[in-house]
Amino acid sequence: MATVVIKIGGSTLEALEEGFYEGVVKRASLGDKIMIVHGGGPAINNLLQAMAVESQFVNGLRKTTAEVLTAAETALSGQINKQLVRSLYQAGGKAIGLSGSDGHLLKTIPIDTDKLGFVGAVESVNVDVLFNVAKAGYIPVIAPIGMDANYQPYNINADTAAAAVAKASKAEELVFVTDVDGVQKDGKVIKEMDEVLAKHYIEEGVIYGGMVPKVNACLDSLSGALTKARIVNGKKAYHPSAGTAIVKQSNVLTSGA
């Protein structure tokens, strides 16, 4: 029985097929502890547009004013979180939607208030909340809105939140759900590669464009008990060996598809 953290990006949500949710539910039914962390950038953008509020990005992070924070919390903890919960139920599973503020799940500290406003980094994770939810037979679905020691909410990058949850829960695997089949070389999906090979492929340009930050997020997550990160296509049925696995140990001799 493994603990698996699945990160679903906001831009991927609308493309997820029913088969993906069914695969997640099946894996949970076989005994794995599944924890989901999600983003919601497009939903936040739509809400900000409706509110006539402009936002900007600094080094890839959304600068979060008080107005932007309200939109982010509404879209993430409300709309997107509950959409995912409903989809898991429709696939035959059981899920509970949580914000990082619930149970002080994601204790947060500001990154740089002057430059980023209410954007936070995860200081600690209350894993007891997650394990209690999982023990009761539910899949926790986490919106990345954290809270500091003074109960101020913060917007957290979903990749960062997922990595923090994976590390704190001592997960064996972290899965990044995207809209592609995995990392490709010569038109074929690479089934598995280690850290050294992944960095080499980035340097050589085999891994390029939008895949680079995804692979870097996988590399950054490989710490502690986490020995494997995986990139999968959310448009297809999810199963444990799908996509590309990036592993900690240098045991991969080839990049064979």
UniProtKB/Swiss-Prot annotation:
UniProt organism field: Shouchella clausii (strain KSM-K16) (Alkalihalobacillus clausii)
Stored SUPFAM superfamilies: Carbamate kinase-like
This protein's GO CC annotations: cytoplasm
UniProt KW keywords: Amino-acid biosynthesis, Arginine biosynthesis, ATP-binding, Cytoplasm, Kinase, Nucleotide-binding, Transferase
Record protein name field: Acetylglutamate kinase
Gene Ontology BP annotations: arginine biosynthetic process via ornithine; L-arginine biosynthetic process
Purpose of the protein: Catalyzes the ATP-dependent phosphorylation of N-acetyl-L-glutamate.
Record HAMAP family: ArgB (MF_00082)
Catalytic activity line of the entry: N-acetyl-L-glutamate + ATP = N-acetyl-L-glutamyl 5-phosphate + ADP
A GO term for molecular function: ATP binding
Enzyme class, first EC level, given as a word: transferase
